Amino acid sequence: MEKQRAILESVIKEEIDFISYVDLEDGMVHTIVTNEDADVMPPIDGDYQKVNDVTIPKYVHPEDREMCEREFRLERLQENLQKKERFVINYRLLCGGEYRRKSMNIHYYDKTKMTLVFVRRDVTDNYEEEQNRQREIYDAML
């Protein structure tokens, strides 16, 4: 069991910034797993909308703010999750003085649809690799 826990922790540290969930009955966000190396983390417990009202204007890239304010609203998330099982929001977040690309994967915890689960990953390296690959393809075509 100890080895399994160590493997799980190493995967979390490498792959995600945090895992949190929102109880749709009371609108409270609860953070259950965090990567100590990640910046801009949600509180352990707090009002979901109030957290967004503070963090989005402060940390989200100006060009992504309006989209994040709209797409992260609980009503909007529930609308989008009626159409598909998972919803992903990609945006830029100010971390340590520079903007990093983040991907938030959101889904329902179970069939009761009373709890939303949020998993945030840093995808900056993947994004930059893809941009470089696209540039190389473009340059090769010229």
Model-found features: residue ranges?
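Short linear interaction motifs
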Residues: 1-4, 72, 85, 98-101
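PAS-family sensory domain signal
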Residues: 7-59, 108
